[in-house]
């Protein structure tokens, strides 16, 4: 089965928890990129993915980097609520599907 390549943007409590408890345990999903403005959160999430017997994901502190190089099939936005619209619109304009962990944020 082909895997859906997911990028996670925002790796605070919500984004890290979604990655750890949901995305790393779903068949057909591979976390291929992690992003947060805080480098320590990016490294922590990348370590988590790798410890879960998945390839180490691409790491970024600028969400725009996830749209380059065919890295993701979709992104999950779990960043600060004030950033959801900006980030979501950017990816939608690139033709990349978006999921927001908070609807209408």
Where would I find each of the regions flagged by the language model?
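Conserved donor sugar-nucleotide recognition element shared by glycan-biosynthetic enzymes
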Residues: 15, 59, 84
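Generic hydrophobic/aromatic pocket-lining and core-packing "Φ" positions
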Residues: 19-20, 63, 88
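Short glycine/serine/threonine/alanine-rich loop segments
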Residues: 54-55, 96
């Amino acid at each position: 089965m082909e895997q859906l390549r997911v990028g996670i943007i925002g790796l605070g409590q919500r984004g890290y928890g979604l990655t750890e408890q949901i995305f790393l345990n779903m068949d057909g999903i591979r976390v291929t990129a992690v992003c947060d403005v805080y480098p320590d959160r990016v490294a922590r999430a990348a370590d988590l993915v790798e410890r879960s017997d998945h390839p180490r994901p691409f790491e970024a502190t600028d969400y725009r980097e996830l749209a380059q190089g065919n890295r993701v099939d979709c992104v999950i936005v779990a960043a600060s609520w004030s950033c959801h619209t900006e980030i979501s619109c950017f990816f939608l304009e690139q033709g990349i599907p978006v999921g927001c962990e908070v609807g209408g944020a």
